[in-house]
């Protein structure tokens, strides 16, 4: 095909088959005048992104990362939320005036001792029946000498490796060991337990031992009371399985292990209750006030 000589020189190159079909050929001519309205364009690779597209892609990634960080409220170490969880990323906002259905996170229940209503009081005061205390005499003891020279003392090492000594006032019993440790049991109050322990230490001193009175401590208190009505122990053990055990073929009472305060209660069908395991008197009273409304709920009607 012959070139059209009537066209300008730059247009002749564009109109030729070589100029139109040759890949990579610039679409402008060095002789192109400035008044044509065409600006020389650099040759670009079609596989590479433009700078504008790259910036847009980075901005989208940053926005997605910020949304994920803002939505991850319940991070590691927190209790999983039930129903209304805030861990899911959401782009919607709550309408003004709306409140969530649950104001606090829902967590699995943990076994706790049922609390007593503040308005309800039993009006019953448990009576202390026994107090166990310990004391350190601070010296080694010859148990045979104590058993031979002291009154109301017995010692049988084949049966028990301690001297068993008793006094009448307060009516208590002491277990005296060769290491100098002593256990006093049988007192009805804290003052009686301390007084009895001092009397036993005085007896040991009079026998020629350098006994002292160190580290006196109450280890256990036992109280009892009567609620004055029969109790359905079968229903109680079914409702409070995690706290109680009841084997009438082995023991006639229900064993209830309270968590706070840490007290063990023996509950009988007649309404008698024994409380043990306390270190101070107040724990006995608190445990009974906690259990009394529960016992009323299982009162026998006939």
From Swiss-Prot:
Start and end residues of each stretch annotated as Disordered: 1-22, 50-81
PANTHER family linked to this entry: TATA-BOX BINDING PROTEIN
Domain of life: Eukaryota
Any Gene Ontology CC annotation: nucleus
Coiled coil: none
One example GO MF annotation: RNA polymerase III general transcription initiation factor activity
Keyword Magnesium attributed: no
Alphabetized HAMAP family for the sequence: TATA_bind_prot_arch
Tissue: Enriched in testis but hardly detectable in the ovary (at protein level).
GO aspect biological process, one term: transcription by RNA polymerase III
Pfam family, one: TBP
Protein name: TATA-box-binding protein
Location(s), subcellular: Nucleus
Spans of repeat Sequence: 128-204, 218-295
Record keywords: Developmental protein, DNA-binding, Gastrulation, Nucleus, Repeat, Transcription, Transcription regulation
Nucleus keyword on record: yes
Main function: General transcription factor that functions at the core of the DNA-binding multiprotein factor TFIID. Binding of TFIID to the TATA box is the initial transcriptional step of the pre-initiation complex (PIC), playing a role in the activation of eukaryotic genes transcribed by RNA polymerase II. Members of the TBP family are differentially required for transcription and development during early embryogenesis. Regulates mRNA levels in the early embryo by both transcriptional and post-transcriptional mechanisms. Required for transcription of a subset of genes at the mid-blastula transition (MBT).
Residue ranges, compositional bias (Low complexity): 50-70
Recorded family membership: Belongs to the TBP family.
